[in-house]
């Protein structure tokens, strides 16, 4: 089987939406019966985004196999059925790290190690490895053409086009076509300059995606085609839309998938986008709306919680309601009190690291529990709910996590490797287990209790969800908390670790150690988010009586 490659680049400005455009095109090709995957090549020197600030980079998306990756991989999984893995995302830092390791081992036999050919060869090897077994691979190059950081990646894909052959490679370039209000027209010159920049490094784009706040007129597209040496039918207008799920239909209506299939000599049926039409219909025809408060510490950049925000919207689609998300800084809860949480239909506390704002999250969990407000805690959101219950219901004053207070009296949450037994001795778990040292990453099994709410929601006794955390519930202190009324609703496959907790005498109080947002999609939703949004609607109705 021959694999075909579509290399996606961006020009003029960043944040044009390369990831969404690539994912939308992949969705159309998948709807034609093709086996499609998408890769993201990031030019930054960090080995992966795992240690990067969410305020700078946005969320870290965790794949099934435990890779910490760019948030664009979340878009890819929400648009296509193919699951991403560590092969779908790599950085300049990862490439240099691999090459330097080989150089130290002597793999290059004393050669002078250079960007060309050693770095570019390493990039090509990873792209080819990631594309194995697929009909079409879309490869998104991060950054903007002209950035010094992107040059090795652009050189590598130029070489790939020569080596694989132009009959199996396409270059798709996204560019900005701005509207000048003073002139009353769109301007094509930035696009021409961007293509000129690409040509200077040996890449002739085959497809141009023209991003604008309005449809680019046919005469302007013809002008772009003429000056950029691209067929007119391959100049695609991609205007701003109110829903990203309209983009597959927008690209298909301009024949982009037909053009690509002809170029690659692929014989495949017409794309059936009925599932996407259903998503658009559900989004456009809500029967009501709810307001959900999300209490976190990175709220100045909503992309830090991208998958959670999308998953809440998916939960709205499944309940035919619009979800209005109110982002609340947990430090504001500390300084202004829980009064700022009034008038919410439900409360969600997402994952996070570090002590800043934690007491505000603990106060939020207490407010939701005591006032019967639907609550969903994710990762740290589960840990603060447990700490709150231990303090205020189980009589464990000053209970905390060793992440925040290492020598606290009741360490109800502790590092995976540092639980204390009943005699006060530190119990160390095996580092050889799949928990992986200090960070638990990737998809793992969870067994649900038959009498739990989550068992009803999932409709299955065993689930698989993705993790990203260092700290766990301390089993040695669990009996006292359970005796006070907290229910452990789910445990890890080996029955060792607490995965889900519930408050039984509450309309809807669920908190999980894993990240359910990473497996939610617009077409299928997710049981926890669908149930949470439904609970928000029911709470709203109760309050209205």
Swiss-Prot record:
Organism: Salmonella arizonae (strain ATCC BAA-731 / CDC346-86 / RSK2980)
Binding site for ATP: 15-20, 72, 239-241
UniProt-recorded name of the protein: CTP synthase
UniProt record similarity statement: Belongs to the CTP synthase family.
Any one Gene Ontology molecular-function term assigned to this protein's record: CTP synthase activity
Protein's GO biological process: 'de novo' CTP biosynthetic process; pyrimidine nucleobase biosynthetic process
The enzyme's E.C. designation: 6.3.4.2
Record keywords, A-Z: ATP-binding, Glutamine amidotransferase, Ligase, Magnesium, Metal-binding, Nucleotide-binding, Pyrimidine biosynthesis
Residues given in the record as Mg(2+) binding sites: 72, 140
Residues where UTP binds: 14, 187-192, 223
């Amino acid at each position: 089987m021959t694999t075909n490659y579509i290399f996606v680049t961006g020009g003029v400005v960043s944040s044009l939406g390369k990831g969404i455009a690539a994912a939308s095109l992949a969705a159309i090709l998948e709807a034609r019966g093709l086996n499609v995957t998408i890769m993201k090549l990031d030019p930054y020197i960090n080995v992966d985004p795992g240690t990067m600030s969410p305020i700078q980079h946005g969320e870290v998306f965790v794949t099934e196999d435990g890779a910490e990756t760019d948030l664009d991989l979340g878009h890819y999984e929400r648009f296509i059925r193919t699951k991403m893995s560590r092969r779908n995302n790599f950085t300049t830092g990862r490439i240099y790290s691999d090459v330097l390791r080989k150089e130290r081992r002597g793999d290059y036999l004393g050669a002078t190690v250079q960007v060309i050919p050693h770095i570019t060869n390493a990039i090509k090897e990873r792209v080819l490895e990631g594309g194995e077994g697929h009909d079409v691979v879309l490869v998104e190059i991060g950054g903007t053409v002209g950035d010094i950081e992107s040059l090795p990646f652009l050189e590598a894909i130029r070489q790939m086009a020569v080596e694989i052959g132009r009959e199996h490679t396409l270059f798709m370039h996204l560019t900005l076509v701005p509207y000048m209000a003073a002139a009353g027209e769109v301007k094509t010159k930035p696009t021409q300059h961007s293509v000129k920049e690409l040509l200077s490094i040996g890449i002739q784009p085959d497809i141009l995606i023209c991003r604008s706040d309005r449809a680019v007129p046919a005469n302007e597209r013809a002008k772009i085609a003429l000056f950029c040496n691209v067929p007119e039918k391959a100049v695609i207008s991609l205007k701003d839309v109110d829903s990203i799920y309209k983009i597959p239909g927008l690209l298909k209506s301009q024949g982009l998938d037909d053009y690509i299939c002809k170029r690659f000599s692929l014989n495949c049926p017409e794309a059936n986008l009925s599932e996407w039409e259903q998503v658009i219909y559900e989004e456009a025809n809500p029967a009501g709306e709810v307001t959900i408060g999300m209490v976190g510490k990175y709220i100045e950049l909503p992309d830090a919680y991208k998958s959670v925000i999308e998953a809440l919207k998916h939960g709205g689609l499944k309940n035919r309601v619009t979800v209005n998300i109110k982002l609340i800084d947990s430090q504001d809860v500390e300084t202004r009190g829980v009064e700022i949480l009034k008038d919410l239909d439900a409360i969600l506390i997402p994952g996070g690291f570090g002590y800043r704002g934690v007491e505000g999250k603990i106060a939020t969990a207490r407010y939701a529990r005591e006032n019967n407000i639907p609550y969903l805690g994710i990762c740290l959101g589960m840990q603060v709910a447990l700490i709150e219950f231990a303090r205020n219901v189980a009589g464990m004053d000053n209970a905390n996590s060793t992440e925040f207070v290492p020598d606290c009296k009741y360490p109800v949450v502790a590092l995976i490797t540092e639980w204390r037994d009943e005699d006060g001795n530190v119990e160390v778990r095996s580092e050889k287990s799949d928990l992986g040292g200090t960070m638990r990453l990737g998809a793992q099994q969870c067994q649900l209790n038959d009498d739990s709410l989550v068992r009803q929601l999932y409709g299955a006794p065993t689930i698989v969800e993705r993790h990203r955390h260092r700290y766990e519930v301390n089993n040695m202190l669990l009996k006292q908390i359970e005796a006070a009324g907290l229910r452990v609703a789910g445990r890890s496959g080996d029955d060792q670790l607490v995965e889900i907790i519930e408050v039984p005498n509450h309309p809807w109080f669920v908190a999980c150690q894993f990240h359910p947002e990473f497996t939610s999609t617009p077409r299928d939703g997710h049981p926890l988010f669908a149930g949470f949004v439904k609970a928000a609607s029911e709470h709203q109705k109760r309050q209205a009586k």
